Amino acid sequence: TAITEAQTKAQADYMAANLKKFGWEYIVVDIQWYEPGAKDHGYRPDAVLMMDGFGRLQPAVNRFPSSADGKGFKGLSDYIHGLGLKFGIHLMRGIPRQAVDKNLPVKGTIYHARDIANKNSVCPWNPDMYGVDMTKPGAQDYYNSVFDLIAAWGVDFVKVDDIARPYHEHEKEIEAIRRAIDRAGRPIVLSLSPGENVLDAADHVAKHANMWRISDDFWDRWLAVHDQFARLKNWNPYRQPGAWPDADMLPFGVLDQGKRTTRLTPDEQHTVMTLWSIARSPLMHGGDLTKTDDFTRSLLTNADVLAVNQNSLNNRPLFDHDELIAWTADVPDSEDKYLAVFNARDRVRLAAEHARYASPLVTRASDSKAAIDVDVSDASRMFLVLDPTGDGVAWDYGVWLAPRFVFADGSERPLTDYQWTRTDAI
C-alpha cells in the first residue's frame, strides 16, 4: 500500500534484466497509490486522496514524483515501456468519497459526483470510495472519463478491486467498466478482485473480464494452497482464451516490504507453481524482485513449467484419489501429454505394514492397559498413531490412554514428557 516510484522502477529493472526473456512482462502498482500518507497494510478513513478536478484519482506526488503537474502515471509508464515491459495499476470500484463531498463535476457532462454516487454501496474494508449508481445519468460518463485518463497514461493492466464480491450486486459496474475500456482506444487487461467469485456468474465474468480472482487474498500458508485445488477444479470449465480464473499471486521470496520471507516450504512452493501452471492461472509474483534468492529465481525461470502455463491445451483434472491429485494437459502440435501429480494431503500417511509393532485394540470398552514389548534401541524416530477404529473417536485418545515407557529397571516416563516434532488429528 505504500510503494514508491523508485521501488517500482527497481522491480521493473530486475524484471527486464532477469525475467523478461522467460515471459514475465507486467509491473503492477498496487492499492493506495493515490494516498500521500499511505501506510503498509492499513487504510485510513480520514486519508486525503489525490484527485483531479473531475474526481479522478491521481498518483501521490510525494511517492511518484514524475506525476507532478498533472502528468499522472505517464512518466512511470513510459519508463516501464522503455524496458520492454507493460504497466498496470490497482483501482478501487466507484468514485472517491472526497469527490462526492466536494460534488465535483463529471467530465464532459452537466452532472456532478452526488448525482451518480450510491452511498449505500461501500467497500467493507476500504473507506475511499462510494459505488456508482449505473441507473443515473452521468454514471457511464464518469467511468468513461476514468479509463480515458488511464489509457492516456499508457496503462496496460487494471485490477479493479471491491467488485467481484458480492458479484451480482456489482454486475452493472462491471459492465460499465468493460464499456469504458472498449471505447478508451487502448488494449487494457481487466482483472477483477477479490474472490471468491460465484460459479453461477461464470458466463458473465468471462464475457466482461480478462481474469478474475477465485479466492480472497492468497498468502503463504499450506491451508490456503490446499483450498485452491478445489477452486481451480471448479472453475476449470470456464477458462477460455482471454478469460482466466485467477488463483492470485505467488507469495515467494521476500514479502511484506522486506520484513520476512515466505512461510511456504520449498516443496509447497513447487506445488503452487505447478498447480498454477497446469491450471493456467495467471502468474503474478508477489515478492520483492530485487531480493530474489536462487531458489525463487529457479521457480520463476523454469522454462518447461512456464511453457505449460502459457501454451498447454485442454487442461483438466485427471483424478483425485484421497487427495492424491493429478491434472493433465495436451502439448501443442503433439500427441504428448503434460502430467502433474500432487500429494495434497495435510498429514503424513503411515502404512501399518511398516510398523515394527501394533498394539492390541484399546478402547473404553476393553482392558485399560496394553503392554507393548518391542525393542526400540536402534530407532531414531517414533510415531504414535491413534487410530479411531475402535469407537470412531480419535481426538482424545492420547489423553485417556496416557501412553508411557516402562524401562528395564521398572521406572516409567509418560510420552508427553518427550519433545514431539508434530501432532496431527486423524
Give short role names for the model-derived ranges.
Residues T271-D320:
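Catalytic cores of secreted or luminal carbohydrate-active enzymes
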Residues M15-F157, D162-Y167:
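Aromatic-lined carbohydrate-binding/catalytic grooves of carbohydrate-active enzymes
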Residues R349-I426:
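Gly-Asp-aromatic-enriched flexible segments
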Residues H270, W276-A279, M284-G286, D320-L350:
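Carbohydrate-binding surface patches
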